[in-house]
Amino acid sequence: MSFEISRKQYTDLYGPTVGDSVRLADTELFLCVEKDYAAIGEEVAFGGGKVIRDGMGQNGTLVRDVDIPDTVITNVIVLDYTGVYKADVALRDGKIFRIGKAGNPNVMENVDIVIGVATDIIAGEGKILTAGGIDTHVHFLGTDQVNTALASGITTMIGGGTGPSQASMATTVTPGQWNTYNMLSAFEGMPMNFGILGKGHGSSKSPLAEQVRAGAIGLKIHEDWGATPSSINTALEVADDMDIQVALHSDTLNEAGFVEDTIEAIAGRVIHTFHTEGAGGGHAPDLIRVAALPNVLPASTNPTLPYTRNTVEEHLDMVMVAHHLNPDIPEDVAFADSRIRAETIAAEDVLHDMGIFSITSSDSQAMGRVGETITRTWQVADHMKRTRGSLTGDAPYNDNNRLRRFIAKYTINPAIAHGVDYVVGSVEEGKFADLVLWDPKFFGVKPDLVIKGGLMVNSLMGDSNGSIPTPQPRTLRNTWGAFGQAVSRSSITFLSQDAIDANVPDLLNLRKQIRGVRGVRNLTKRDMKLNAEMPDIRVDPETYQVFVNGELITSKPAETVPMARRYFLF
């Protein structure tokens, strides 16, 4: 005999199912569940009077070695570049083990995931699960950046620096073997995945290559060190030899050449361009053109995202401080002013919406905010829906195409750009279990739970002296997986394969998991998931207006943004 309940009652019990829509935070963006792995009437849920009990939803006889997961997240909505669906997600040995239907095959049919005695349960009903974010543009200045980023949903930080030196504040570079070794050692106690960018400036390949052998997973070229065609070519030659990425902050002042000269120096080799719009630095006024090239993986940094009525005004002082400029020197002021063009900033959001710009990142404390990359990515998506309407294929209360495009910008695409997508960047079986669980009304703003390597490392928790977990103030705090030797299980240090071959982990007694970067030099723009468009892009040299395939591309500055004051007191 079948039993019927209302759709609302079902949603209250097990979360939304196929055809249901969910608003993300206070935006105009809605996800719509496309598939549900659950068998209706056979759902598993944990709690008093519920299903996951010995002999019911839990198998009480099988030992862990018989493919029993360590943790199952039940009835959760997965939002990933691969799709929008509802499932039970099993974690085992720090990886995503299986995605499907959980339960006990002794009493249930079509069970993909067997819940056993060894299995912990995280209730995902009504929640959204995403991959942990990946920030590829981090200036390693202060250690507090790590917790700030983690509490925003970022689980991998790639960048450079040695602390608050002037060069680190400006250039995202960890120079030389000694500094690289020290930073790799410092990463050991932090619940975050890390990768280091070395200095990509040298007249010969040897001093660049030694940084890669020391552990750098990429080389950074920055105009403050001189982004010359010679530096670009030498860095790319080393990258081709050692299968690493080159990140480029190009020549704002056009000292050593114009954008055409930089394109010529790159010579068709893959490169990851930072703040490709140009306000963060790069050939004035037309760096943005490189986003059309098949060998360029173009990124934005978050201070220009989205374009608002305050964006231009805040940037002048930001440039002056970040690049050690003197406001009393007219040439320094002119340099800063040349980087800030409302016309190209206005085009940037649209280029993201069209899938031309592929990646978002922070530029932490150096013209960017390390805890806002995820929030600002979704603010852009919201602003674009409000001003440009739905994307092709989307519908009322269904923005899945736009959502998949935008989530790819801070998950899978940065992972691909740095050769770590075989480990992190998506919710797929076999990947390292770096996952973020969100309450929809706080989506993109404040996570409920951050999981790293299958361990809970940061969580929304109430007063620790409370009789229950929920008394105010509820704040995001590090939990057990972020402490002691658990950090070595929950987190990864990414190294070049040359550094692994040189036994750097043993030399430094690194205890974190080690993974090598790979497959970087074979990449093209076509590898950027859902963000691989390559139209003709032109910039008017007098008005700075941006044209895509001959059509003017611009947007009005937002007067207000979602995911802002409603969620933050400060």
UniProtKB/Swiss-Prot annotation:
Q: What is its main location?
A: cytoplasm
Q: Does the keyword Transmembrane helix apply?
A: no
Q: Which residues are involved in binding Ni(2+) 1?
A: H137, H139, K220, D363
Which GO biological process entries does UniProt record here? urea catabolic process
Modification after translation: Carboxylation allows a single lysine to coordinate two nickel ions.
GO terms for cellular component: cytoplasm
Per the record, residues carrying N6-carboxylysine are K220
Q: What is its EC number?
A: 3.5.1.5
Identify its protein family: Belongs to the metallo-dependent hydrolases superfamily. Urease alpha subunit family.
* Entry protein name: Urease subunit alpha
| UniProt organism field | Corynebacterium glutamicum (strain ATCC 13032 / DSM 20300 / JCM 1318 / BCRC 11384 / CCUG 27702 / LMG 3730 / NBRC 12168 / NCIMB 10025 / NRRL B-2784 / 534)
